[in-house]
């Protein structure tokens, strides 16, 4: 049968429904007919050379991130970093100066925010503003980065725009700036990427099934040949035994025993075919979830200076400060600046304990550290934190480092 997956999106202030199709036929003939219909529907919109390049890359299926790398698919890394990651974990997004400039707003930071808020109000799009003394401000490291660009007087009066992922998505699709065309082009490119990757998964599965079936047919042919040879041997043995007067009862028993062994092997082969069908069903589920999986990862940014980074250092000062550790999260260029400033002005003897480059969501990493600590008496009573500051006994320093490293490794889990 042809399984249809429906995905709803909103483009240019209108809602559209996109259908993707997965194959599940009852027999080989039905599968071939359905596959031809699917190719007629989809292939005309795809670049077949990119698809073939991905198929030729490996006999193991690759994820969407590797797929983009292999095919050199043209997609905006900033959009993935600032939008699709937010969509994946459903977190709130701070509208930073970088985002406003990416959307095409020009001028001073304050003027950019005013222009964007004007659009939001005109289109009745929800947003929130945090005052400078809001206790949740520390959840958005880029607020601190943007604050450095403003005077203290302006910072004290500033309000920082916060939006959820759906509202942010609506807003960028309603832009009328110099970059609005590029942003809409991104959505069209992303739709093509989804279709191309789903077709890649289909083709990969088809190839894998053919390889399995070919191997299985070879095995069955060998078993049929063995059975035929066994029967021929039995006939010859009967003839030989008859010629020398042996009792045919013993020969018949041996023949039945051989036949039973062959039947057992055939039954085992049928079990193997059933296992393959169950594996295919599981793969159907994987293909169906690809629409979610594409949001789970993002290609690495080409410019190292704007890749996200997470650093934890030990202050190593002579005071008895309860918070002896400090975390910095943000783009690499920002982290380098903060480290230099803190080392020259406050912590000349600092020791960097953790430096994770290209951590896709460093803020998320720090929050998950707190989540891991909370509720566990063996850790909760021995760790304290305030903002980016962390305190623990020196005996637990190694344990703290291991927790961060373990949390970072979880980004590789699919």
Swiss-Prot record:
The keyword Coiled coil applies. This is Putative MSV199 domain-containing protein 148R. Residues 209-293 form a coiled coil. InterPro entries: DUF3627 (IPR022549), MSV199_dom (IPR018879). It comes from Invertebrate iridescent virus 6 (IIV-6). The keyword Isomerase does not apply. Keywords: Coiled coil. Signal peptide: none annotated. It comes from the Viruses. The lineage of its organism: Viruses, Varidnaviria, Bamfordvirae, Nucleocytoviricota, Megaviricetes.
């Amino acid at each position: 049968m042809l399984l249809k997956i429906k995905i709803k999106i909103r483009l240019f202030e209108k809602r559209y429904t996109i259908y993707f199709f997965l194959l599940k036929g009852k027999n080989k003939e039905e599968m071939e007919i359905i596959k031809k219909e699917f190719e007629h529907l989809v292939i005309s919109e795809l670049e077949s050379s990119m698809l073939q390049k991905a198929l030729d890359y490996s006999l193991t299926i690759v994820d969407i991130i590797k797929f983009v790398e292999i095919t050199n698919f043209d997609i905006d890394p900033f959009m993935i970093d600032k939008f699709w990651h937010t969509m994946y974990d459903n977190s709130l997004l701070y509208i930073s100066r970088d985002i406003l400039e990416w959307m095409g707003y020009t001028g001073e930071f304050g003027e950019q925010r005013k222009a964007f808020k004007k659009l939001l109000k005109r289109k009745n799009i929800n947003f929130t503003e945090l005052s400078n003394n809001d206790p949740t401000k520390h959840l958005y490291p880029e607020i601190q980065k943007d604050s450095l660009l403003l005077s203290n007087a302006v910072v004290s009066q500033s309000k920082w725009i916060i939006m959820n992922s759906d509202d942010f998505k609506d807003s960028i699709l309603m832009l009328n700036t110099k970059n609005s065309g590029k942003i809409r082009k991104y959505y069209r490119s992303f739709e093509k990427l989804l279709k191309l990757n789903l077709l890649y998964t289909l083709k990969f599965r088809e190839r894998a099934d053919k390889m399995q079936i070919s191997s299985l047919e070879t095995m069955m042919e060998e078993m049929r040949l063995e059975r035929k040879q066994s029967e021929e041997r039995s006939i010859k043995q009967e003839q030989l035994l008859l010629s020398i007067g042996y009792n045919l009862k013993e020969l018949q028993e041996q023949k039945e025993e051989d036949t039973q062994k062959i039947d057992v092997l055939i039954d085992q082969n049928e079990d193997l075919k059933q296992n393959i069908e169950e594996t295919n069903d599981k793969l159907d589920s994987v293909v169906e979830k690809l629409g979610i999986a594409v949001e789970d990862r993002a290609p690495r940014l080409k410019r190292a200076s704007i890749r996200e980074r997470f650093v934890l250092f030990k202050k190593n000062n002579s005071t008895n400060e309860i918070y002896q550790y400090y975390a910095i999260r943000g783009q690499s260029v920002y982290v380098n600046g903060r480290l230099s400033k803190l080392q020259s002005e406050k912590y000349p003897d600092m020791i960097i304990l953790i430096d994770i480059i290209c951590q896709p969501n460093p803020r998320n990493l720090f929050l998950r550290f707190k989540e891991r600590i909370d509720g566990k008496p063996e850790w909760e009573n021995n760790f304290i934190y305030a903002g980016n500051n962390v305190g623990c006994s020196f005996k637990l320093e190694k344990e703290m480092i291991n927790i961060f490293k373990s949390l970072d490794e979880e980004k590789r889990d699919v």
